[in-house]
A protein has these predicted regions:
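Register position in tetratricopeptide repeats
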Residues: 22-23, 56-57, 90-91, 124-125, ...
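Short coil turns that delineate tetratricopeptide repeat
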Residues: 41, 75, 109, 143-144, ...
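Alpha-helical linker/edge segments of TPR/alpha-solenoid repeat scaffolds
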Residues: 196, 222-246
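Canonical positions in the second alpha-helix
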Residues: 35-36, 69-71, 103-105, 137-139, ...
């Protein structure tokens, strides 16, 4: 039996690192990647894998550094461009994320995650129709991805197409992938449609799968607050303002301050009291009367 070649041995080490990342055993994955780099200091894929670990551990500066080292050795390393796009997106450097995605799409035009990232950015910027188009492209490439289908549901909800949104939400759930990301996006979609019970159910599933994720925990707490109808009623104007341009919001506030000043003051006081009361009720529901940090 012939012995394994050096290239085959390196491929086995790549697979080992990827497997550890999939298991969220990031410390071991880092040790394996660093050991590989000691043996193969010019291995662009090893640098890209190390960068990927740092994205997963939310150390975005390190992820950008090591992906840059990978691209110095191979300017078209596919994983390195994907890591850079995610690192910029997750650290809220959205313009740089778009630039990285553009370059990544040139290198790997059939990678659906670039279209997904662009869609997420356009959703954040209120460009819902463009976002929907990018999500549909991602689904054309990978039709069985539950997170992409959930994002299409969210985009449809933001566009006011609630029937289509519910249909895509069902399709995402039928893909039967246990993913905290998918459940979180479906929760956003349900909230946008006004399906608050469904919103809370999806958040419960997300937090079950990843109870330590800060974004999911915060969304779950907010979901519990919004389960109180009075809070939702008072929150409605602020939800509407999010869809408006800043100058429109300013004009409405100025007009309300001039015409309805006493009522506006009462509304603000009631809103603040309701916000903190529901926050207290949620805390007591989850943790009892203990307020220790």
């Amino acid at each position: 039996m012939s012995s394994m070649t050096n290239a085959e041995a390196i491929d086995v080490r790549y697979s080992r690192i990827s497997h550890l990342i999939g298991l969220k055993r990031y410390k071991e994955a880092t040790e394996e990647a660093e050991a590989l780099l000691r043996d193969e200091p010019e291995d662009d894929q090893a640098y890209a894998l190390l960068a990927l670990i740092y994205v997963h551990t939310e150390q975005y500066d390190a992820a950008l550094h090591w992906s840059s080292e990978s691209l110095k050795r191979d300017p078209e390393n596919r994983l390195a461009w994907l890591v850079r796009t995610n690192a910029y997106h997750d650290s809220d450097k959205l313009d740089k994320a778009l630039d990285a995605a553009t370059e990544g799409m040139r290198v790997d035009p059939y990678e659906p995650h670039y279209y997904f990232i662009r869609a997420n950015i356009y959703l954040k910027r209120g460009r819902y129709a463009e976002a929907k188009s990018y999500i549909e492209t991602a689904l054309d490439i990978r039709p069985n991805n539950a997170a992409y289908m959930a994002s299409l549901s969210y985009a449809e909800a933001l566009l006011g197409n609630h029937a289509a949104s519910r249909q895509h939400a069902r399709e995402a759930l039928n893909l039967s992938v246990e993913s905290d990301t998918t459940f979180l996006i479906l929760a956003w979609s349900a909230e946008q449609r006004g399906d608050y019970e469904e919103n809370l159910n999806m958040l419960k599933e997300a937090i079950r799968l990843d109870p330590n994720d800060k974004q999911i925990r915060e969304a779950y707490m907010e979901g519990l607050q919004k389960s109180y109808k009075m809070y939702r009623i008072l929150l409605a104007p602020f939800t509407l303002f999010k869809r408006m341009k800043p100058w429109q919001v300013l004009l409405i506030w100025l007009g309300a301050a001039i015409i309805f000043r006493p009522l506006l003051l009462i509304f603000i006081i009631v809103y603040v009291l309701t916000h903190w009361l529901t926050k207290l009720l949620v805390h007591v529901k989850l943790f009892g009367w203990s307020f220790k940090k």
